[in-house]
């Protein structure tokens, strides 16, 4: 079970809004583009590494890599085109192998639509993966591209995750609206 110790996002203002993250949190960001997601991923990873945490990057998308495979970051390259069951099994095996207290970054979940051609499976993947990450006391970042998913899929993800953030630009400023 999670220990609920406080964890920084690496962004001071976001830490204030959320009163920090806790071990066990899964954080989903609804964004307009990958760059918006990356702007939150990089400080999260820097802060985790500075605290001597293990960082694992689950790479499965066609977008530019969010993180580079340095000696400090473990990168797993996964094949989403192998199908939902194979992909989910790969991810769960990695999570089990990595163990507790790991800080994860996942590529954008919306890109799984390209491989699986169904929104339902994206929601299913999240619903079976998020509780497993929670059990192992991890912190994990995920992204969804705004407007790419059905209301039902977003609702299932919202119901499962611990933190859901709507990230958008307004008058050349990045705004974050916590939805959960």
Predicted regions and their residues:
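Short, charged/polar "capping" segments at the starts of alpha-helices
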Residues: 37, 63-68, 149-151
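Hydrophobic/aromatic beta-strand patches that form the interior of the parallel beta-sheet core
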Residues: 27, 56-58, 74-76, 141, ...
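Conserved catalytic network of the ASCE P-loop NTPase/AAA+ motor domain
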Residues: 19-22, 47-51, 95-98, 131-136, ...
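Glycine-rich P-loop/Walker A and Walker A-like loops and their local beta1-loop-alpha1 context
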Residues: 6-62
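Phosphate-binding/switch region of NTP-binding enzymes
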Residues: 138, 144-180
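Structural motif
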Residues: 28, 103-107, 141
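Conserved inter-motif catalytic segment of the P-loop NTP-binding fold
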Residues: 51-114
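Substrate-engagement module of ASCE P-loop NTPases
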Residues: 115-116, 121-148
């Amino acid at each position: 079970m999670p220990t609920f110790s406080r964890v920084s996002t690496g962004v001071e203002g976001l830490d204030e809004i959320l009163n920090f993250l806790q071990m066990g949190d899964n954080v989903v960001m609804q964004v307009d583009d990958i760059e918006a997601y990356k702007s939150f991923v990089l400080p999260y990873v820097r802060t985790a590494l500075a605290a001597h945490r293990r960082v694992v990057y689950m790479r499965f998308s066609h977008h530019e890599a969010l993180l580079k495979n340095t000696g400090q970051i473990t990168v797993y390259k996964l094949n989403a085109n192998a199908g939902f069951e194979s992909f989910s099994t790969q991810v769960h095996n990695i999570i089990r192998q990595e163990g507790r207290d790991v800080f994860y970054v996942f590529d954008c979940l919306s890109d799984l639509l390209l491989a699986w051609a169904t929104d339902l499976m994206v929601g299913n993947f999240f619903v079976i993966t998020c509780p497993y990450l929670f059990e192992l006391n991890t912190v994990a970042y995920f992204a969804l591209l705004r407007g790419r998913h059905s209301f039902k899929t977003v609702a299932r993800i919202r119901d499962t995750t611990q933190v859901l953030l709507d990230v958008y630009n307004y008058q050349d400023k990045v705004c974050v609206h916590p939805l959960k």
